Regions:
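Beta-propeller blade termini and top-face loops
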Residues: 1-253
Length: 253
């Protein structure tokens, strides 16, 4: 990961999987810093904030993709203190694939992490609370699973995920899917109603199950959409499995 300090672009932080570096000359030279960070990390991500140019956060997981901790520096990355090493549920088992952290530009203690879900803290990472609901597409707090990108632009927090780009203006209470109108996807399976040839459902890689009513596609479950089917005697009943057949979902519309 690499981050530039918003209020002082001469300061740049960079990480490898296990090492933390700092430049104070716009990237011409880097020095290893980060005392207090884990020495056996598998991946690290960085967050900086315009609210305080001295503060930098590091999010760390083990080589086995287990949550290692959230670490905070108040001296521009020279030393770090572990602020949260116990909330292991924050990280998914695929942190090698999806992992992100960001901080509010107006409140240095407000941070967000992303793995499978988005988590929020208002006390500098000491306690984290899940804000989104990836498995309920109709929920106001829904955003797709697998978070790769979290970043503030003004008062808007943007989230880049396997299912598109989402934005919240109220700290994660509500998310808006900015890519909702882009009807694109990678189907695993497709089923067509025997009663109504305009009724189609599809299970999509990374994007759950979708129903087409002849006019538009509507998502009715999340995760990875796999096998799907429509009741042969009732076109309003649609079914879909997620990855590995773990759960079966049903739509009645």
């Amino acid at each position: 990961d690499l981050k530039i300090v918003p209020n002082d672009p001469t300061i740049i932080y960079a990480t490898t999987a296990t090492l933390f570096y700092k430049s104070i000359d716009s990237g011409a030279n880097f020095t290893q810093v980060g005392a207090g960070l884990p020495t056996s990390a598998g991946r690290m991500a960085i967050a900086v904030t315009a609210a305080d140019s001295n503060i930098v956060y590091a999010l760390s997981v083990t080589s086995g993709n287990i949550f290692q901790g959230i670490y905070k520096s108040t001296d521009q990355g020279e030393t770090f203190t572990a602020v949260n090493t116990t909330q292991t549920q924050i990280a998914s088992i695929q942190a090698y694939y999806d992992m992100a952290i960001t901080a509010s530009p107006t409140n240095a203690n407000e941070i967000y992490t992303g793995f499978l879900n988005i988590w929020k803290s208002v006390n500098g990472g000491v306690t984290m609370t899940q804000v989104n609901n990836w498995s309920s597409p109709s929920s106001a707090s829904y955003s797709h699973a697998d978070i790769h990108f979290l970043r503030f632009y003004g008062n808007k927090l943007y989230c880049g995920s396997d299912g598109g780009i989402y934005v919240t203006t109220n700290g994660g209470t509500n998310f808006t899917d900015l890519t909702k109108s882009m009807q694109i996807g990678q189907p695993y399976k497709i089923a067509i109603s025997k009663q109504n040839s305009n009724k189609i459902i599809s299970g999509l890689q990374d994007n759950g199950g979708h129903v087409f009513n002849g006019i538009r596609w509507q998502n009715f479950y999340g995760a990875d959409g796999m096998d799907v089917g429509i009741d042969p005697t009732n076109s309003n009943l649609s079914y879909g499995f997620i990855q590995y057949g773990q759960s079966l979902y049903k739509s009645t519309t």
